[in-house]
A protein has these predicted regions:
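Short, Gly/Pro- and small/polar-rich lid/capping loops
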Residues: 1-57, 67
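Conserved beta-strand/loop scaffold segments within soluble protein domains that form the structured core
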Residues: 34-37, 44-200
């Protein structure tokens, strides 16, 4: 079992709600394990019985700790940007031996101005032995602004012995530029499955 904190919920505006419906294909809800980053700030947060999300003290971002008791559980960590600027976030996932979890991430940009909006998400996964992890990342941009809508994801995956990691990424539409970097290190008998869709 992991240490839990009291959940923080907020009322979201319509733009944020609409973007979340696109980037979170499982359906974002302010319940269970979740963390919504909006314009560079974590605005709502919750832990589950077996998943704890802790704000980093040295870098912008969070540590997500997933207990071995987590079985067929989900954690949702979307990012929405509706204001111009650069947002860089470092998220680290620590998955204990034997855990079974789906991690739903991704970023949506709503741009109405002439300035650039850019999100760089650096995600690192530390997966123990005999675990099953599915990571779903959707990218999307919308709005009538002329400013660039840029998403640059970096994914580092370290998979322990006999574990399975499934990586599903989709660039839905509206993104002007993207640079994706992926690094993978597999332990003995570990497996990696990758599905990448570019729809823009």
């Amino acid at each position: 079992m992991v240490s839990r904190k009291e959940a923080i919920t907020v009322k979201l505006n319509q733009v944020t709600e609409d973007v979340l419906k696109v980037i979170d294909s499982y359906g974002f809800k302010q319940e269970g394990a979740y963390n919504l980053r909006l314009n560079g700030m974590a605005v709502c947060h919750g832990d589950s019985r077996h998943i704890a999300i802790v704000k980093k003290t040295d870098l912008p971002g969070i540590d997500i700790r997933i207990s071995s008791e987590a079985q067929n559980e989900q954690v949702h960590i979307p990012v929405v940007m509706s204001e111009p600027g650069l947002d860089v976030v470092y998220n680290d996932f620590y998955v204990e031996d034997g855990a079974d979890v789906t991690i739903v991430a991704g970023c949506g940009i709503h741009g109405e101005g002439c300035s650039e909006t850019r999100h760089d998400g650096i995600h690192t996964f530390h997966v123990g032995k005999n675990a099953n992890v599915k990571y779903v990342e959707n990218h999307y941009a919308e709005g009538n602004g002329t400013g660039g809508k840029i998403l640059n994801p970096v994914t580092k995956i370290y998979v322990g012995e006999n574990s399975v990691f499934t990586l599903e990424t989709t660039q839905i539409k509206g993104v002007d530029s993207t640079k994706r970097e992926t690094f993978v290190e597999l332990g003995p008998n570990a497996k990696l499955y990758v599905t990448e869709k570019l729809m823009t």
